[in-house]
Amino acid sequence: ELGVERRFVPESCPRAVRPGDFVRYHYLGAFPDGTRFDSSYDRGSTFNVFVGKGQLIAGMDQALVGMCVNERRFVKIPPELAYGSEGVPGVIPPNAVLHFDVLLIDLWNSEDEVQVQTYFKPEKCPRTVQVSDFVRYHYNGTFLDGTLFDSSHNRMRTYDTYVGIGWLIPGMDQGLLGMCVGEKRIITIPPFLAYGEDGDGKEIPGQASLVFDVVLLDLHNPKDGIAIENQLVPESCERRSQTGDFLRYHYNGTLLDGTLFDSSYSRNRTYDTYVGKGYVIAGMDEGLLGVCTGERRRIIIPPHLGYGEEGRGKIPGSAVLVFDIHVVDFHNPSDSVSITVHYKPSNCTVLSKKGDYLKYHYNASLLDGTLLDSTHSLGKTYNIVLGSGQVVLGMDMGLQDMCVGERRTVVIPPHLGYGEDGVEGEVPGSAVLVFDIELLELVSGLPEGYMFVWNGEVSPNLFEEIDQNHDGEVLLEEFSEYIQTQVETGKGKLAPGFDFEKIVKNMFTNQDRDGNGKVTAEEFKLKDQEAKEEHDEL
């Protein structure tokens, strides 16, 4: 009788040998006394054969039926189910009982197809692999008995290929179709859809079934353009970015499987660039057009519009890029100051002009609403002489032609604000500034170029009046005391908003033409006299 002893049966046995199946197995052949007559191990290759088709001795044909991959059986075959009364000359004597220690390695049928078992699938799957798509995936490749023959993980790089155009073995071409990014599946491929009778000449023997444990990381098609997903669009969007605009934005950059490769947030500063001029990758150039300040959008960029086949830094070659961006502000180099008046008193006859002394309150913010500064929090006004360079040029422009009590919003582009450098720790570089302003007080200034004017007629003996000790020389102390008296008595007026001592010293220095610290009658001239002399010379 045929004797079959199951010495090891794996816990999992999804499939057992049936007549007509093709098997690969190892064996030791011995006589009952233990004398070995054959071994597949000695030859270094499995025995490969169809079961139930008369290609084996009858006893082995029967003994293999019902076996699982990785199962081990001890088989006793009587001579009438083996080589009978004739035996095999020189190897097996007549009427010999044969013992076989069998280990099943592989099993398939010519009717088999590719088997796909998905064991993880993301909840969101906006796109699946189609013919002609380009994919990047990791895999572990094993035989049916679990022996590893290859792994992309060991090489620490994905396998990158087109699907469905013959770049892969036919079974893998089929097995990858319909996958989502992030999906994990086991693809079992019979040899006639893999490397066939000859194997690959290296690690994979002939007639081997292959098992690939695959995780899909990336997917695109060469015909893809960028994809934009609007995540947040402000209700108010007065202006959208155009080619030539300069943008400041934050971003998180990830691969399609969610792997982070870069983030402006980690550097605590925005990414600042022109749009549509080739300063950024082509896909980002396109994806940043038409955005509003404050908008959040996701831009998905295929590799031919990103970093191509070579990649860069942490970005692998042929990688789809996902940028989650937040637009902080944008402007155009041709922009000027923008003024929006919210309130203007009905009696608005005196308008601010260059040289006027202004007191005003303001709230300063970035274009996205981030508060930078506020005079209200300081409890005092901000005081300047308009047009004197005490504020940025854009503010000088924005405060022109205001009346007391007026409220307005002034938007200042960076080239009229703090420029590319900004103010360290306070104002970012290339930032658009928004000032909400209320003018509280206006003191009219003097004509341009004047630091002091008379409110009445000028004394014809002006030098003698200043020279109190009549020594023919005026010192700074005498000059300062005289000017102060004129201001206090209302006979003269100093330019408002400046330090008294600095103005007086400046006036004195202008008169002290030889720089000896004294002004003589010959040096002393009024401004209108100086202008007349210059005219006469001309």
Predicted regions and their residues:
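Cross-family detector of peptidyl-prolyl cis-trans isomerase
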Residues: 1-538
